[in-house]
């Protein structure tokens, strides 16, 4: 569903943001 897509997009954005800041991605 659309909610699942938003969840995946949000997690991907957080990973990219963490990598951009030089931090390790949290799981």
From Swiss-Prot:
Annotated signal sequence range: none
Record's keyword terms, sorted: Amphibian defense peptide, Antimicrobial, Secreted
Top-level taxonomic group: Eukaryota
GO biological process, one term: defense response
Localization, UniProt: Secreted
Function: Antimicrobial peptide.
Protein name stated in the entry: Caerulein precursor fragment R4
Organism whose genome encodes this protein: Xenopus ruwenzoriensis (Uganda clawed frog)
